[in-house]
Amino acid sequence: MAESILKSAKINRNVGQVLKSYLRVLKLSKKPSREEFLMISKVAGAGILVIGFVGFLIYVLLTEVPKWV
């Protein structure tokens, strides 16, 4: 019984430490400016398009190339 109490106290302490670190990060962070947000959005959108295009190329290669061989 004492072991379970110690275990739960240790878990509570760990949760408290994690929450403190999350709060510290939130305090240090700032809202991005409009220009920063637009740049991040463009880069993320370009990355999504590139990954989609690569996936489409792989799909075409795996479905059409076997027909030629």
From Swiss-Prot:
Transmembrane segments in this chain: where? 43-63
Superkingdom in the source lineage? Archaea
Q: Which InterPro entries match?
A: Prot_translocase_SecE_dom_sf, Translocase_Sec61-g, Translocase_SecE/Sec61-g
- GO cellular component, as recorded: plasma membrane
Q: What is its main location?
A: membrane
In what way does this protein cross or attach to the membrane? Single-pass membrane protein
A Pfam family reported for this protein in Swiss-Prot or TrEMBL: SecE
Query: Which keywords does the record carry?
Result: Cell membrane, Membrane, Protein transport, Translocation, Transmembrane, Transmembrane helix, Transport
Kindly list the biological process annotations in GO that this record carries: intracellular protein transmembrane transport; protein secretion; protein targeting
- Report the GO molecular function annotations: protein transmembrane transporter activity
Where it sits in the cell: the answer is:
Cell membrane
Keyword Cell membrane present in the record's keywords: the answer is yes
Hey, what's the signal peptide range on this chain?
none
Q: How does it assemble?
A: Component of the Sec protein translocase complex. Heterotrimer consisting of SecY (alpha), SecG (beta) and SecE (gamma) subunits. The heterotrimers can form oligomers, although 1 heterotrimer is thought to be able to translocate proteins. Interacts with the ribosome. May interact with SecDF, and other proteins may be involved.
**Family, per the entry?**
Belongs to the SecE/SEC61-gamma family.
Please describe what this protein does: Essential subunit of the Sec protein translocation channel SecYEG. Clamps together the 2 halves of SecY. May contact the channel plug during translocation.
Which NCBIfam families does the UniProt entry name for this protein?
A: PRK09400.1-3, secE_euk_arch
- Official protein name in the record: Protein translocase subunit SecE
Organism name: Methanococcoides burtonii (strain DSM 6242 / NBRC 107633 / OCM 468 / ACE-M)
Q: Which gene encodes it?
A: secE
